C-alpha cells in the first residue's frame, strides 16, 4: 500500500491506497445497501443494532486484518507487531436514521484508548467522501502538542478550544485507509446531504512497544455482558 496523502510523523495522518481493499469495500457497501438498509425502521435502538452488526461482517474483518493493511502499518508507521486494541467501530453520520447525528466537535481519541503512545486509528469509508458531505475535519500537525486541554465526556475527549485554525476537510475515496494518530485533533462533519455516510475504524497498537509493556498493556476498552438481555422481546 502506497501513501497518497499526508505524512504520519509530521502531520499526524497518512492516507494509503490498495486496489484489493477498495474492491473489498465495494462488496461491503453492496451488502450494506442490499441487506442492512432495508431492515431500518422507526425503532432507533434496532437501527443502531443493525449498524453495529456491520462491524461484525466477515468481509469487514477481512479488511482490517488484511496482510496489505498490516504490512502498511509496519512499512509506513513502524508497527512491527500490530494488535487490535478495540472493536471495529461504525460511524453512521449522515442523518438520524439511527437516532444520533453525532457531529462530534474537536476532540482527541487518545483518552478513549489509554494504550501506548504508538497507537494508531485506521479509518475508512464505504462511500467516497467529498467536500460538503459528512466526513472528517482534521488539524494537521496537532498531534505534536500531545494531549490538548479538554474534558472527558460520554461522547469522547472534547477540547476546550473549538476555534482552531489550520483545519482541513478530508476528501477520501471509498476503501482508502486513513491512518491517524490518537493525538490528532479532528471533528466529525455534518451536512445537509440527505444520503447516508458510513465509515469504519479500528484501533491498533504495537505489542513490541516497551512503554506499553511497562504500563502492563492497559487499555480503556472493557468487555461487558448484559446477563438480562435474553429476557427482552418476550
Predicted regions and their residues:
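Non-heme Fe(II)-dependent double-stranded beta-helix
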Residues: 1-106, 112-113
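Non-heme Fe(II)/2-oxoglutarate
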Residues: 3, 27, 36-38, 177, ...
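Short, well-ordered beta-to-alpha junction loops that form the rim of enzyme active sites
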Residues: 18-20, 86-88, 125, 141, ...
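Short, conserved beta-strand element in jelly-roll/cupin
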Residues: 107, 114-131, 171-172, 179, ...
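Double-stranded beta-helix
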Residues: 129-189, 209, 217, 221, ...
Amino acid at each position: 500500500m502506497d501513501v497518497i496523502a499526508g505524512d504520519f510523523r509530521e502531520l499526524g495522518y497518512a492516507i494509503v491506497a490498495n486496489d484489493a481493499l477498495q474492491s473489498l469495500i465495494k462488496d461491503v457497501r453492496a451488502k450494506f445497501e442490499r441487506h442492512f438498509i432495508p431492515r431500518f425502521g422507526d425503532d432507533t435502538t434496532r437501527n443502531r443494532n443493525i449498524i453495529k452488526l456491520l462491524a461484525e461482517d466477515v468481509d469487514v474483518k477481512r479488511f482490517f486484518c488484511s496482510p496489505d493493511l498490516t504490512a502498511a502499518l509496519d512499512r509506513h508507521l513502524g508497527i512491527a507487531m500490530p494488535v487490535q486494541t478495540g472493536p471495529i467501530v461504525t460511524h453512521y453520520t449522515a442523518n438520524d436514521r439511527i437516532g444520533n447525528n453525532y457531529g462530534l466537535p474537536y476532540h482527541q481519541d487518545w483518552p478513549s484508548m489509554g494504550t501506548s503512545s504508538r497507537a494508531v486509528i485506521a479509518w475508512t469509508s464505504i462511500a467516497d467522501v467529498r467536500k460538503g458531505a459528512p466526513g472528517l475535519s482534521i488539524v494537521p500537525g496537532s498531534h505534536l502538542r500531545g494531549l490538548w486541554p479538554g474534558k472527558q465526556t460520554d461522547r469522547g475527549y472534547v477540547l476546550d478550544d473549538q476555534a482552531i485554525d489550520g483545519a482541513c476537510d478530508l476528501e477520501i475515496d471509498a476503501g482508502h485507509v486513513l491512518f491517524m494518530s490518537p493525538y490528532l485533533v479532528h471533528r466529525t462533519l455534518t451536512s445537509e446531504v440527505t444520503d447516508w455516510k458510513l465509515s469504519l475504524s479500528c484501533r491498533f497498537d504495537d505489542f513490541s512497544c516497551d512503554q506499553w509493556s511497562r504500563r502492563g498493556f492497559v487499555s480503556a476498552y472493557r468487555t461487558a455482558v448484559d446477563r438480562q438481555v435474553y429476557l427482552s422481546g418476550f
